[in-house]
Amino acid sequence: MPLLNVDQHGYLSTGLSPNASGGYAEQVLAQSSLIFEVPNGLDADSAAMTEPMAVALHAVRRSRVKTSEPAIVVGCGPVGLGVILMLKAAGVKTVVASDFSPNRRKLAEQCGADIVVDPKETSPFANWKEFGLLGNVSDAINMGMGLFDKLQATRLPWWHGWRMIDKLGALPKRPVIFECVGVPGVLQQIIEGAPLFSRIVGVGVCMQSDKIEPALAINKELEIQFVLGYTPLEFRDALHMIAEGKVNCSPLITGVVGLEGVTSAFEALRDPEQHAKILIDPKRSGSDIQLMKH
């Protein structure tokens, strides 16, 4: 794990502090207790994906998504693609992926997304009726009161019937929406489009101020939560999921470059049609990016 215990400073993230430097160096100081053995002869390229996959695993676990609940991933960069992989590994039956980039949508399909949409043409929330979701308060009131009327017509006390239906999971599904963009305005767009009772999970890191309309989220009874990082157990589990073939993260690796090419790699990553994730190999010479074909 990229953490270093630096005396009075405690644990610091490697490469993000002067006291725990070495993010892009030939050698880096590692915490011996946080070194994990790579299992099953896993290749170095795949093992290097453990950290971003641990982030995705943490997001999926914290979301409490059920296998029967539709999951919607907004943004198919490396974070979103990792979330798609972990959702499918968790057994989620329906994963919808949304991105403007044709290349990213193609990668989302390779990662296991069941439905891929271009938000310029189709909202990722357009098919909510097909998934048994509720789109507005009026639908919820009519559904609830219709159920209430039917239960009152039975011999059993209606509240017992309601509890039984709730226990059996027969009430409307609650979709889980993963915001993996991290750009101001996206969270508000999701709130506007999300079906009732959705759970929104903020995975993308927005570094700027943003605005949302709480009243709209209240009327839809939305849950909004944010996630960060991972635990040592999730880091270990992500590594073993990759090694055991439960997660195939190779579609994310679109290029490899040496240390001399780090600057050009960041420039290349600006174009979503070119790359998703570029691995840095300190042993590789030259600044050219080697394209990976899958």
Could you say what each language-model-derived stretch is?
Residues N19-G22, N40-R61, V74-G82:
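A glycine-rich, Thr/Ser-enriched phosphate-binding loop motif common to dinucleotide/cofactor-binding enzymes
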Residues R199-V201, I212-L252:
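Rossmann-fold dehydrogenase core element
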Residues G144, R163-D166, Q188-E192, P232-H294:
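C-terminal hydrophobic helical "lid"/dimerization subdomain
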